[in-house]
Amino acid sequence: WFALDTSTGIETAGSKLYMRLTVVSFDLLVYVPALIMFTKTWLSPRSKRTQEQALLLLLLQPALLLIDHGHFQYNSVMLGLTLLALDFFATGQDLIGAVCFVLSLGFKQMALYYAPAIGSYLLAKCIYLGPRTGLAHFTRLGVVTIASFALLFLPFYIPSPSHIIHPIQRIFPFSRGLFEDKVANFWCASNVLIKWRKLAGDNESGRSWLVRTSAALTALGFIPSVLVLLRSGWTMRLRTPSHST
């Protein structure tokens, strides 16, 4: 239970203004530049007017304005960093893009939604580049990614190496069960008709089974897309004999 009338925290006009200003500030620092770069990069063949219309449409996205900004989730920062990664990938700056995506993952674990596609794209590019160039590119990406994660987790590691487990548990909150944070949409929706926890057993082994099952089905769902991306890298390589080295 919770105290409905006394657990709301500070709700002064000044605190609300401060929180809203932080959202606007982070949007101006991360999200808006990412959108501007996106329209200029991905819509470069189109007219300037079309680019401006696309930018305005993206800036007025109702989901961010009405929901995320309303309760200060700062999802625009995560989305902005992911979009910056895609922008840099599109311009051939894969290493900078990898750093941006690591920052996105570090900011909010929801960026894991995009990890299979981004990882598959980069691996497909390494395949396309050929054994020698592709392996060198893969190595550079690996070093940059590991170094970026190491710097992110360093503040947790320095006081005590055991502290590093806490952010990892927050990124992968399996210990909280399948219905953590209402992000398991299929399971929450289907639970109206099929009581999954009752079916699996409302105990530790039952919760563990649900987590393993959902993870396996999630992987099964995105594996076809991963294979398509990897195959595209291989077929493009076969069509380009100049990348055989």
Sequence positions of predicted segments:
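Membrane-interfacial catalytic/cofactor-binding modules of polytopic membrane enzymes
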Residues: 1, 5-23, 61-72, 76-81, ...
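Transmembrane-helix signature of polytopic, membrane-embedded enzymes
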Residues: 2-9, 29, 34-62, 239
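Transmembrane alpha-helical segments
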Residues: 30-38, 81-89, 116-123, 147, ...
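Intrinsically disordered, low-complexity, Ser/Thr/Glu/Asp/Lys/Arg-enriched terminal regions and linkers
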Residues: 40, 88-89, 107-108, 141
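Membrane-interface transmembrane helices that cradle and orient dolichyl/undecaprenyl
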Residues: 42, 48, 83-96, 126-129
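Hydrophobic alpha-helical transmembrane segments
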Residues: 52-57, 99, 138-143
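Membrane-interface alpha helices of multi-pass inner-membrane proteins
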Residues: 63-66, 84-85, 95-114, 245
